[in-house]
Amino acid sequence: MQLDSKHFEEYIMVAPGSDYGVAMWSDIKNVENAVFLDYVIDSKNRVLQLLHHIHFSFGINSRVQLPLQQLWKHQYAINKLRIDSKKRVCIIFTDISACRTDVSYLKHLHELDNVTMVMVLVNVMESKHKLIKKRLSYFDQVYSFDRRDCEKYGLSYYPTFYSITRKTVEKDKIATDAFFVGVSKGDRHSILTKLFHDIERTGGKAEFYLSGVGQSEKHDEGIHYDQWLSYKDVLDRVMETNCVVEIMGKGQSGLTLRAMEAIVYNKKLLTNNESVKELPFYESGYIQCFETPDDIDIDFIVNREAVDYGYNGDFSPIHLLEKIDEQAT
């Protein structure tokens, strides 16, 4: 498809290089006047990729800026594109791909007269605050899915987005009643363990992957502790479950990957995320939003029924490109 834009002749997307990043952004690959770069550097050499990853380590560089990062310039995928100075170009980074790019190179791109720089935060600002703060001035538009971050840092709000990468699974191929994967700390841990056992007691099947659990609390048989899943593995399990479970920590807000997966792939959703009430899909009856564990209806989780949200590309990143074009000057 050709994106009809008032301000840009070409879009360049610098993706974060992860499989979940592909799931979020891959619709852009279908846009004729867009270039999709899978990662910051253009190299299949795993040693080089590892060295780049270490040199731009979020943990290390948040404490002390490692020197000589500008040496990566000639490896940047975007540098090899040779941006046409006669075209109006929009370059989009995520917070992750921006933080894996040298600040001086971002400054160089920002100074090009025909380029508009956009950053899209797919994580809360707190997670990489120091690194992002160094780069903010080199972006013309900055978006976040988190309303609190938008209010605190003066960012533009845009809900998270998602691209369909799988075909839906037939109802008779559903293997579990509930699926959860994520960090399980504090209040979340007690909610999740109780929910797991409540489902199992009804004869249902729950598949929970919990991380961040203290050794003394890893005693619930049937729960998977600290078992890493690739995003492909996560999607495999989402496709085969009846209900996706999402338990948010205190202070978190905004639409999440789990919620979008449930809606896009027609799964029931159990969540304590109040943000889902703002969605038109909330009235479908396939989403249960609870305040306390006592509010959870186990029958909602285990009862099998055909789920259809009538989803029609509502979360596609194509709409973000349209928004960016609207906000451009």
Regions found by a protein language model. Give the residues of each.
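N-terminal pre-catalytic "stem/leader" segment of glycosyltransferase-like enzymes
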Residues: 1-122, 141, 276, 317-318, ...
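Short, polar loop motifs at secondary-structure junctions
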Residues: 18-20, 126, 143-151, 210-216, ...
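Active-site regions of enzymes building and remodeling cell-envelope glycoconjugates
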Residues: 28-38, 48-57, 139-143, 151-164, ...
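A conserved nucleotide-sugar
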Residues: 79, 196-214
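Structural alpha-helical scaffold elements that stabilize or flank donor/cofactor-binding regions
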Residues: 84, 135, 236-237
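Alpha-helix C-terminal capping/helix-to-coil transition sites in glycosyltransferase folds
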Residues: 87, 138, 239-240
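Catalytic core of nucleotide-activated saccharide and alditol-phosphate transferases
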Residues: 98, 103-200
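Donor nucleotide-activated moiety binding/catalytic core segment of transferases
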Residues: 208-322
